[in-house]
UniProtKB/Swiss-Prot annotation:
PANTHER family (alphabetical): POLYRIBONUCLEOTIDE NUCLEOTIDYLTRANSFERASE (PTHR11252), POLYRIBONUCLEOTIDE NUCLEOTIDYLTRANSFERASE 1, MITOCHONDRIAL (PTHR11252:SF0)
Record's protein name: Polyribonucleotide nucleotidyltransferase
Catalyses which reaction(s): RNA(n+1) + phosphate = RNA(n) + a ribonucleoside 5'-diphosphate
UniProt xrefs under PROSITE patterns: KH_TYPE_1, S1
Sites where the protein binds Mg(2+): 486, 492
Organism, scientific name: Escherichia fergusonii (strain ATCC 35469 / DSM 13698 / CCUG 18766 / IAM 14443 / JCM 21226 / LMG 7866 / NBRC 102419 / NCTC 12128 / CDC 0568-73)
Length: 711
């Protein structure tokens, strides 16, 4: 009954298994892909008929991680998986981006890809496995798909490229790059790097593409054995007469409209032309399909913009191919934030803030690969007003999560180490205007805001979006693309980095035939653009401010004897809780005795440090301290001498004469000098007021052990 078909092959240091025909036989196609115990089950379902009036391709990619894959039960209240995490959303996008361009134009049948992680080896990230599974399932399904694709992760360790590095190897790597493509062409790159050169990044892309050919070959072999018949799908025949009629009415007018440099004005004019053209044609023949007319008009728009670029004419906004739009850079624009910047590039604008917090503010991520703490948070918000529209405002959408992660990757390489700058840092980018590459504007704004906040970043970083228009062997690479150029072009190519190298690279290619040489031209052109933007940014602020904001918490660090940690924490946390409440500070203690005190007020921090030093102070026998009477008993009085330590003054040690009644000499709360006579094995302290008053030396406060103290 069950007849599994299996293919095994070696992929770098891992063994990959593709299995189909065993499960989910009612899906259009299903594949179980495993790579060294990390297994992802991928299904594809395609509808044989498109919905009437459907004018876009409804492809959905869902990626879901099951905690049973790692032998765990979810920690949520309901003890089951809920909405997708940020990590799951990012991997769903990673799968979607290289497969979407491979469906034929005009194909609008609904297709859903579901990738479920069912087993995980902590050393093998499921994302590459899921991408291979999606490629295999689509290739097996018979759905019109111009694949398969391969996928590879590339690391860079000891000046060598490493194929599909393990999680441990990635910690040593200067690069984390994912590349996907067909046999002939690269389609997608997603990466972060420790400021590598253009040549090193391009080498990694080429290396990954070469290595993934084994995946493509094995998927093709599996399809020969188990593939379903290819769907008999044909695109709608082109109505040449209608195309010519629409072009006659609209092409010249659209060509003129695309010389309007202001985005909103241009959009308004284009909308008028489209509406009037459609109205004219429907008046001539009411049986015409309005959606079809819209598609023809869109194709004319695309052709107008592309042909003008290829002919060497100025772009939509009048720029040459390698020109950057006008820049406006401002820092310190919000008075009470810890750091802020307003970065404007043409009609794209980002208001970016940086906020400093303590280690307690770090985000704890409960991931399938294990729990980790993130001390650098980057959030990107894209409100509808940024493009002059109305819309829903709420939790971030897939696009916002993806753009935020890309911008974070651009900045991560220059962030200081926690031991040098022990703060959790949150950057928020509010896109206030958008016309192309708001994610790269967020990188520039983040660099400025972090410097304004006094975060000692290693270098300033900037980002730029590149585009490509290609027809045959003729191509033009565009710097700093507009939204329209992104939409109508063949490649979206985003590069972020410093003067020294690249920190993030993202490529999405919509056509085949992008060669290594074209990518080289784009990278070199992007470098020139990046250096130009950095030059303008450096005029506004060229180094991190010498001090953090007065409104940011200052972290003071002292070192105590690890044996004394229990004294500072107290029973059930009572001492540290009282300390934080009474001093108005935040206190964190590490196992090695490092104590971090965070406060916006320096005096509060000093008070907390003094009290911690008192608690951890060693009591010195023979020394005189100032104490306070805390309890009176028949045989003497208990006196607190600081740091939560209390000793007994026996009735015989109160005065140099016989004392009948303790209360004749001492009252509750009275401050008295006391001399330490003895500290016994159990830590009990014997004190004397009599001997303290006889001594001429002044009373002392408890002395703290030598401490490393810094800010």
């Amino acid at each position: 009954m069950l007849n599994p078909i299996v293919r095994k092959f070696q992929y770098g240091q891992h063994t990959v298994t593709l299995e189909t025909g065993m499960m989910a036989r009612q899906a259009t196609a299903a594949v179980m892909v495993s790579m060294d115990d990390t297994a992802v089950f991928v299904t594809v379902v395609g509808q044989k008929k498109a919905k009437p009036g459907q004018d876009f391709f409804p492809l959905t990619v869902n990626y879901q991680e099951r905690t049973y894959a790692a032998g765990r039960i979810p920690g949520s209240f309901f003890r089951r998986e809920g909405r997708p995490s940020e990590g799951e959303t990012l991997i769903a996008r990673l799968i979607d981006r290289p497969i979407r361009p491979l469906f034929p134009e005009g194909f609008v049948n609904e297709v859903q890809v579901i990738a479920t992680v069912v087993s995980v080896n902590p050393q093998v990230n499921p994302d590459i496995v899921a991408m291979i599974g999606a490629s295999a399932a689509l290739s097996l399904s018979g759905i019109p798909f111009n694949g398969p694709i391969g996928a590879a992760r590339v690391g860079y360790i000891n000046d060598q490229y490493v194929l599909n590095p393990t999680q441990d190897e990635l910690k040593e790597s200067k690069l984390d790059l994912v590349v996907a493509g067909t046999e002939a062409a690269v389609l997608m790159v997603e990466s972060e790097a420790e400021l590598l050169s253009e040549d090193q990044m391009l080498g990694a892309v080429v290396f990954g593409h070469e290595q993934q050919q084994v995946v493509i070959q094995n998927i093709n072999e599996l399809v020969k054995e188990a593939g379903k018949p290819r769907w008999d799908w044909q695109p709608e025949p082109v109505n040449e007469a209608l195309n010519a009629r629409v072009a006659a009415l609209a092409e010249a007018r659209l060509s003129d409209a695309y010389r309007i440099t202001d985005k909103q004005e241009r959009y308004a004019q284009v909308d008028v032309i489209k509406s009037e053209t459609i109205a004219t044609l429907l008046a001539e023949d009411e049986t015409l399909d309005e959606n079809e007319l819209g598609e023809i008009l869109h194709a004319i728009e695309k052709n107008v913009v592309r042909s003008r670029v290829l002919a060497g004419e100025p772009r939509i906004d009048g720029r040459e191919k390698d020109m950057i739009r006008g820049l406006d850079v401002r820092t310190g624009v919000l008075p009470r934030t810890h750091g802020s910047a307003l970065f404007t590039r043409g009609e794209t604008q980002a208001l970016v803030t940086a906020t400093l917090g303590t280690a307690r503010d770090a985000q704890v991520l409960d991931e399938l690969m294990g729990e980790r703490t993130d001390t650098f948070l980057f959030h990107y918000n894209f409100p509808p007003y940024s493009v002059g529209e109305t819309g829903m405002v709420g939790s971030p959408k897939r696009r916002e999560i993806g753009h935020g992660r890309l911008a974070k990757r651009g900045v991560l390489a220059v962030m200081p180490d926690m031991d040098k700058f022990p703060y959790t840092v949150r950057v928020v980018s509010e896109i206030t205007e958008s016309n192309g590459s708001s994610s790269m504007a967020s990188v520039c704004g983040a660099s400025l805001a972090l410097m304004d906040a006094g975060v000692p970043i290693k270098a300033a970083v900037a980002g730029i979006a590149m585009g490509l228009v290609k027809e045959g062997d003729n191509y033009v690479v565009l710097s700093d693309i507009l939204g329209d150029e992104d939409h109508l072009g063949d490649m979206d190519f985003k590069v972020a980095g410093s003067r020294d190298g690249i920190s993030a690279l993202q490529m999405d290619i919509k056509i085949e035939g992008i060669t290594k040489e074209i990518m080289q031209v784009a990278l070199n052109q992007a470098k020139g653009a990046r250096l130009h933007i950095l030059g303008v940014m450096e005029q506004a602020i060229n180094a991190p401010r010498g001090d953090i904001s007065e409104f940011a918490p200052r972290i003071h660090t002292i070192k105590i004897n690890p044996d004394k940690i229990k004294d500072v924490i107290g029973k059930g946390g009572s001492v540290i809780r009282a300390l934080t409440e009474e001093t108005g500070t935040t206190i964190e203690i590490e196992d090695d005795g490092t104590v971090k005190i965070a406060a916006t007020d320096g005096e509060k921090a000093k008070n907390a440090i003094r009290r911690i030093e008192e608690i951890t102070a060693e009591i010195e026998v023979g020394r005189v301290y100032n104490g306070k009477v805390t309890r009176i008993v028949d045989f003497g009085a208990f006196v607190a001498i600081g740091g939560g330590k209390e000793g007994l003054v026996h009735i015989s040690q109160i005065a140099d004469k016989r004392v009948e009644k303790v209360t004749d000499y001492l009252q509750m709360g009275q401050e008295v000098p006391v001399k330490v006579l003895e500290v016994d094995r159990q830590g009990r302290i014997r004190l004397s007021i009599k001997e303290a008053t006889e001594q001429s030396q002044p009373a002392a406060a408890p002395e703290a052990p030598a401490a490393e103290q810094g800010e």
